[in-house]
């Protein structure tokens, strides 16, 4: 009886430990309880929790990298890049600290009726592009995976489009040089802002596990933006021409859909029409919302020649300005 009394006395204290609703800390609070739940899942506005965060800020995504390399791992296409100075990173939104860019990889299926890992409103899409970031203090993605706040993956759904998406085309054009597994080639280089749409609001966030081929499970934050990419039938055919480790066409590399298990799905800073969970593809590409980081602003000579338009220019009053 004494033990039960003590447990009852401690219960209110446990509840009081939860951060206040509306804070970024309240989102992090649920990682302990939901970070081990399986992924991917279906997301939708229905059943999600509307939650407001500061604007998500995209730093250095207009800066040209020194090189961009794509690799056919035999399981996916992996895109990595290197910069001579500071790499792109995220700040703001649900992040209290800087999260730097790590890599991009893709998931696809054997036809246009499958391929995406996540579904939206129970609908499957032909492909999905996942962009991985990690908390800068952990130095590497592998180290960051061992911390519940270490890694975030942004999952862009790829819809079917009659025309080719130019944002994907400069990547797809390199596939003929990496048809065999474990082969790589350089492409571009172009800034990451040319590959995927940036957003500062209107996205879903949830906690879930990332399983590796070694059987390890890591807690990851998954972001699914309402903004999407699109791919033509011909572009998707190029994905299916890539070989797996057994010298066969890699036709399917997506994981099966998992149950939601009553976890929190945060609908961060909703803004546009909520008639559909995904936004329509804009007829005209959205202008870049990338920000130049203080490191480049104070040392503009670190910018590559292709970014001359970002260099400080002297105005009529003799003052420097960024154009």
Segments (PLM) and residue ranges:
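Alpha-carbonic anhydrase
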Residues: 1-323
């Amino acid at each position: 009886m004494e033990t039960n009394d003590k447990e009852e006395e401690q219960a209110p204290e446990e509840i009081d430990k939860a951060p206040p609703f509306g804070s970024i800390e309240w989102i992090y609070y649920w990682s302990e309880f939901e970070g081990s739940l399986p992924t991917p899942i279906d997301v939708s506005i229905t059943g999600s929790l509307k939650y407001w965060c500061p604007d998500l800020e995209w730093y250095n995504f207009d800066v040209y990298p020194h090189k961009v390399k794509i690799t056919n791992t035999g399981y996916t296409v992996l895109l990595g890049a290197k910069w001579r100075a500071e790499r792109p990173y995220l700040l703001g939104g649900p992040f209290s600290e800087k999260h730097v860019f790590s890599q991009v990889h893709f998931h696809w299926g054997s036809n246009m009726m499958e391929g995406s890992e996540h579904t939206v409103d129970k609908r499957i899409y032909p492909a999905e592009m996942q962009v991985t970031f990690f908390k800068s203090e952990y130095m590497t993605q592998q180290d960051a995976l061992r911390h519940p706040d270490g890694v975030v993956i942004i999952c862009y759904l790829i819809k079917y489009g009659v025309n080719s998406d130019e944002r994907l085309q400069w990547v797809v054009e390199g596939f003929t040089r990496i048809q065999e597994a474990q082969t790589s080639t350089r492409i571009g280089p172009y800034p990451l802002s040319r590959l995927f749409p940036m957003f500062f609001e209107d996205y879903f966030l949830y906690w879930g596990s990332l399983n590796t081929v070694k059987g390890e499970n890591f807690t990851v934050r998954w972001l699914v933006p309402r903004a999407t990419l699109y791919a033509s039938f011909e572009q998707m055919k190029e994905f299916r021409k890539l070989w797996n480790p057994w010298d066969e066409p890699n036709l399917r590399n997506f994981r099966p859909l998992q149950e939601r298990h009553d976890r929190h799905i945060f609908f961060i800073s909703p803004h546009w029409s909520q008639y559909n969970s995904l936004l329509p593809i804009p007829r005209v590409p959205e202008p870049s919302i990338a920000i130049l980081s203080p490191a480049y602003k104070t040392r503009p000579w670190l910018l590559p020649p292709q970014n001359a338009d970002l260099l400080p220019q002297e105005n009529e009053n003799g003052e420097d300005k960024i154009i």
